[in-house]
A protein has these predicted regions:
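Single conserved hydrophobic/aromatic residue that forms the stacking wall/gate
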Residues: 1-13
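A broad structural signal for short, well-ordered beta-strand segments within beta-sheet-rich domains
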Residues: 112-114, 126, 202
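Conserved nucleotide-binding/hydrolysis modules and their immediate coupling elements
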Residues: 133-135
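Beta-strand-rich binding/interaction modules
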Residues: 97-119
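Short, cationic motifs built from Arg/Lys/His that form the positively charged side of catalytic pockets
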Residues: 6-7, 105, 139
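C-terminal beta-rich recognition modules with glycine/proline-rich loops and embedded aromatic residues
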Residues: 10, 14-94, 119, 123, ...
Length: 267
């Protein structure tokens, strides 16, 4: 995705996974040929077609997108706190008496043992209703049927294929569908000296102030490797305990020029 400035006044064209002075560390205001900004507008106006589709027997919900959608079969209102919270509610107001299916896409990162589905307050065996990544619910829908999905959104460590040489020995963090990165403004200079532990105990925080307000941040114990002043030395770098902070990748470069990295060495 293209990282967008919080004021929408500029954006970053490069989909880089680390940011240093020589690789466009800030957001330019404009380009001679600017294709991404109008494409973003086109995306917003097309969201409805990405979120839903309909067949003769089934309504398909492809995204946990808060909205009200009007179809031949029903009007469906979706209340969603995703991706920051694991709760999505569908309110179905049927236009027809015949039964039809509502198929809800369940992202692959959601663990089935944490997924709870209720229909009008009654718990449903979600595992038996899922096929090819969709939760299928079929019944004679009324004028105010409510489907509620709840699930956990743990912080996950992601590893690259070993054929990706640049990412060997590194991990990235994700929570739900959101990729995270580490910026120098939170973690100090020399980002490459930071290390992620093999076993992490991450905590999340909803940011309430500044340009990142509304975003969920990740805090976790980590390490900083400190070496001697020599360019090369036989002295092994010393490890210092630190608290690391990660922000959503799309939000980087909103707080001035500083280093950024997605893939972090694992210690």
């Amino acid at each position: 995705s293209t990282p967008i400035k919080s004021s929408a006044a500029s954006d970053v064209y490069k989909r880089q996974i680390f940011g240093y002075k020589h690789v466009l560390p800030t957001r330019p205001g404009w380009y001679a040929c600017a294709c991404c900004p109008p494409n973003l507008v086109r995306l917003v106006t097309s969201l409805g077609t990405y979120a839903w589709s309909e067949s003769e027997t089934t309504l398909y919900s492809h995204l946990f997108l808060g909205q009200t959608a009007d179809f031949e079969k029903a009007v469906v209102k979706v209340d969603s706190s995703y991706p920051w919270e694991g709760k999505v509610t569908y309110q179905v107001k049927a236009k027809m008496k015949d039964a039809f299916e509502l198929a809800i896409h369940i992202p692959s990162h959601i663990r089935m043992d944490t997924l709870c589905v209720t229909v009008n307050g009654e718990k449903t065996d979600a595992a038996s209703c899922i096929k090819d990544g969709y939760l299928y619910l079929k019944q004679n829908w009324g004028e105010n049927d409510v489907i509620e999905l709840t699930f956990d959104l743990p912080v996950r460590k992601i590893y690259a294929n070993t054929n990706v040489r640049e990412d060997e020995g590194c991990v990235a963090l994700m929570r739900g569908p959101v990729v995270y990165c580490f910026e120098g403004v939170d973690n100090g200079e020399c980002i490459q000296a930071l290390r992620i532990p093999r076993e992490i105990k991450a905590e999340t925080e909803l940011c309430k102030e500044g340009v990142l307000a509304g975003n969920v941040l990740i805090h976790l114990p980590g390490y900083r490797m400190e070496s001697s002043d020599a360019l090369y030395s036989e002295e092994r770098p010393k490890r210092t305990d630190v608290t690391l902070t990660a922000i959503p990748y799309y939000a980087w470069a909103n707080r001035g020029e500083n280093q950024m990295r997605v893939w972090m060495p694992e210690e």
